[in-house]
Design a protein with these regions (language model features):
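Beta-strand-dominated extracellular/periplasmic modules and repeats
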Residues: 1-145
C-alpha cells in the first residue's frame, strides 16, 4: 500500500500586489510619465517578414464571466522559426519583430494582437515544433486549487 508523502505540500500562492496589471501597462490606466509607450504594445513594425495575422480572444472565468482585470502576454518565434531572444543561437532574427506582446483585457475580457504567423522551430532531434504562440495570463485571484 502506498503512503502519502506529507512533506510534499502545495506551494502557497503568492501575489504580486494590487498593481500588477497597472504597473505592466501604466499608460492604459492613465498613469503618465512612466514610459512613453507600454512595453509589448507592438509585436511587429513596418517591414516585418511573414504573413500578418490578428490574434483575438476573450478571457473568462470558470462561470463564463469575462475577466476584464487581467493582462495577456504572447511569446512566439518569427516567420522563420527564430526567437528574438538572447538565448537564440541562430542568426537571422527579423529586426522588425519583437517576439512578444502585452495587452490588457478590456472590461469584456477581450484582447487583440497584430502579429505574424510563427514559423516552425527546429528541435535538437532534427524535427520541428508545430508553429505556435504561447499565452501568459496575469489576473487577480489566480490560484492553484
Amino acid at each position: 500500500m502506498s503512503k502519502p508523502l506529507d512533506y510534499l505540500k502545495e506551494t502557497p500562492s503568492q501575489t504580486a500586489g494590487p498593481y500588477v496589471h497597472i504597473g505592466m501597462t501604466p499608460n492604459e490606466y492613465d498613469i503618465g510619465g512612466v514610459i512613453p509607450e507600454d512595453l509589448g504594445l507592438r509585436v511587429v513594425s513596418d517591414g516585418v517578414k511573414g504573413e500578418r495575422i490578428k490574434v483575438t480572444g476573450r478571457v473568462i472565468d470558470g462561470g463564463g464571466n469575462p475577466v476584464g482585470d487581467c493582462v495577456v502576454e504572447i511569446w512566439q518565434a518569427d516567420a522563420n522559426g527564430i526567437y528574438n531572444s538572447p538565448m537564440e543561437h541562430r542568426s537571422g532574427v527579423d529586426p522588425n519583430f519583437s517576439g512578444w506582446g502585452r495587452q490588457p483585457a478590456g472590461s469584456s475580457g477581450e484582447f487583440s494582437f497584430d502579429t505574424i504567423k510563427p514559423g516552425q522551430v527546429p528541435l535538437a532531434s532534427g524535427g520541428f515544433m508545430a508553429p505556435h504562440i504561447t499565452f501568459w495570463i496575469v489576473a487577480r485571484g489566480i490560484n492553484v486549487g
